């Protein structure tokens, strides 16, 4: 998940890169070197949403990934610290979810990743205990729904939506907190449903739970035309609600990046998933994106 290039000026692209690199440094500063390897565009967009309307001047330094030319980055701030902590907590609990979802042999890579991230998770959890508890509780409820083979996509999506929405409650300003809670709630709902569509073929083949299978009574690992139309309406609803919440706050210099993501980027990703042309690295296991903007 990232902004659509067609809507970004060169200045916006540089600013988004600086957030991406600033979050990478924040992950290391807050949670240790291992935390840097969960960095991806989803978490960078979270950092954008949490950032104040005015951006500081970026700094420039070499780093582990770019030891010669270096990169611009924003220095550690409250927004980057919050994004870093919440990203680590979310990544760690998603790894626990992946371990539970796979057999002993298949879960080895997730166990290894969780072990590497353990120290980072403990630091982040101590800094954000409320979000840590919320993440655990929502994923546990989601696991129970999966075990029950819940046929309601709304009930299943609700847990991940509420989980992301809980990040908004970490923000002190009451108005911004409410705006972010709504934006992140509907973003979480959208992510859950798009992931379900992206995983549908594999889940059906492996006999794994996928809410779309039970909601639409699918007899193969592909959506019927009627099911696809219904899912598109549900995804569009979440994007519209997210956009409505966005309009209630002035995001300043970040407005173009957010608009590009909400009004175009999400539609393009959803379209690619439904057409079978989108191949994402599994979110449940985290994973670092390369800067290709």
What are these regions (language model features)?
Residues 258, 262-264:
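Membrane-proximal bilayer-interacting regions
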């Amino acid at each position: 998940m990232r902004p659509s290039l067609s809507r970004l000026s060169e200045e916006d692209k540089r600013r988004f890169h600086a957030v991406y690199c600033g979050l990478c440094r924040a992950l290391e500063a807050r949670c240790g070197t291992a935390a840097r390897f969960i960095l991806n565009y989803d978490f960078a967009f979270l950092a954008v949403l949490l950032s104040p309307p005015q951006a500081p001047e970026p700094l420039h330094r070499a780093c582990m990934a770019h030891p010669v030319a270096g990169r611009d980055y924003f220095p550690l701030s409250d927004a980057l610290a919050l994004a870093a902590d919440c990203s680590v907590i979310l990544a760690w609990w998603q790894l626990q979810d992946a371990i539970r979802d796979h057999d002993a042999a298949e879960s080895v890579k997730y166990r290894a990743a969780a072990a590497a991230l353990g120290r980072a998770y403990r630091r982040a959890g101590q800094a954000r205990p409320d979000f840590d508890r919320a993440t655990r509780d929502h994923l546990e409820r989601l696991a129970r729904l999966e075990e029950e083979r819940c046929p309601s996509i709304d009930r299943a999506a609700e847990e991940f939506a509420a989980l992301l929405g809980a990040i908004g409650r970490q923000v002190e300003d009451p108005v911004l907190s409410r705006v972010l809670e709504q934006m992140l709630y509907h973003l979480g709902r959208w992510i859950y449903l798009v992931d379900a569509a992206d995983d549908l073929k594999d889940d059906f083949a492996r006999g794994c739970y996928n809410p779309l299978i039970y909601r639409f009574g699918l007899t193969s690992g592909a959506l019927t035309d009627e099911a696809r139309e219904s899912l598109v309406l549900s995804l569009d609803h979440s994007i519209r609600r997210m956009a409505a919440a966005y309009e209630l706050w002035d995001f300043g210099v970040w407005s173009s990046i957010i608009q590009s993501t909400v009004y175009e980027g999400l539609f393009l990703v959803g379209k690619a998933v439904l057409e079978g042309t989108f191949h994402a690295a599994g979110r449940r296991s985290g994973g670092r994106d390369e800067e290709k903007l």
